[in-house]
Amino acid sequence: MTLDLVLVCPGCRTRTPERLDVKTLERTGDLLVCECGRQYPIIDGVPIVFADPAEYLRGEIATIVERDLSPAVAALLVAAGPDDAPYPRLLEHLSIYLDAQWGDRAQPRADGAGFALEAVIARLAALPHVGAAVELGCSVGRVLAELAVHAEHVVGVDLQFGALRRARRLLDGERVAFARRISGRHYAPAEIEAGDRVVPAARRQIVCGDALDPPLIPAIYDRVVALNVLDSIARPRQLLAVLDGLCAPGGELILTSPFAWQSSVMHEHERFGGADPAADLAAILTTGDGLGARYQIEDSAELPWTLRRDARSVLSYRTHYVRARRT
């Protein structure tokens, strides 16, 4: 398998009871092209591949055409607000997740809570080497970098283009400057380098796409990862089915979630597990309910997960970790 072949056209993908038909995308300049005629843009090294790319582009054009501004200029642009405008929202999102994922490699280090992945990375570091790993919800790319330590090829999918631009640059070995939120719309400059977590482009692919409809060839990934995505997506049961569909025979799923269900994200009937969603998740995996296979739970734990919003505000979760083998 080469990474040139892992992206498929979601627009013409067809499924019947007997088979799934997919067409791979070929690169032509700054486009990925399908023989069906559909085309998908590659911007700053990141392909944007959705079944309806026009709808995504209309809603996210501000983050797609965003320039690399110095932290001082970026902070000045958002100072007047409002908070819910696209660029202030992007700047806040990047501040939170760059520190959460790369805070141990940031200069200066964040005051208070910063790096949030220590417990997860320790578990990933103990896993055996595999051929291919995929992460849905890869954000700014740190877990993708850790997966690459124990995988020949890694693929990351996320909906947030601004985060993926930073992931691509960090994994390429570039120094990324960002604005770290101090209070309200006030920011201070910081920067990150991946160091020994650089991942050569020949070994990885980053794509802007829908985790519920990823443009990926099914059933080829030995390690399938989705960290803190389950309760951040409209259809968590569908996400489990997608993860199962990507998993190769004998492969493993790695999931974390604090199960912080929100009505603004999903309908009430999409929630599962009542007072003990971790037990319900284990039951879904071990029985194969709604999936194409059953899974054996090989590891589970309750891990800390903190997100620094600014110098005075931290979101703290206890996230459930589970690693399960396809049987």
Q: Regions from the language model: what does each represent?
A:
Residues 96-131:
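Conserved alpha-helix/loop element of class I SAM-dependent methyltransferases that forms part
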Residues 140-150:
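Conserved SAM-binding loop of SAM-dependent methyltransferases across substrates and taxa
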Residues 160:
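Conserved SAM/SAH-binding beta-strand->alpha-helix loop
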Residues 171-212:
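S-adenosyl-L-methionine
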Residues 183-184, 266-300:
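Conserved Class I S-adenosyl-L-methionine
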Residues 212-224:
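A short acidic, Gly/Pro-enriched loop at the edge of an enzyme's catalytic core
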Residues 237-249:
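A short glycine-rich, Lys/Arg-flanked "PGG" loop and its adjoining helix->strand segment in the class I
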Residues 250-258:
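Conserved beta-strand signature within the Rossmann-like core of class I S-adenosyl-L-methionine
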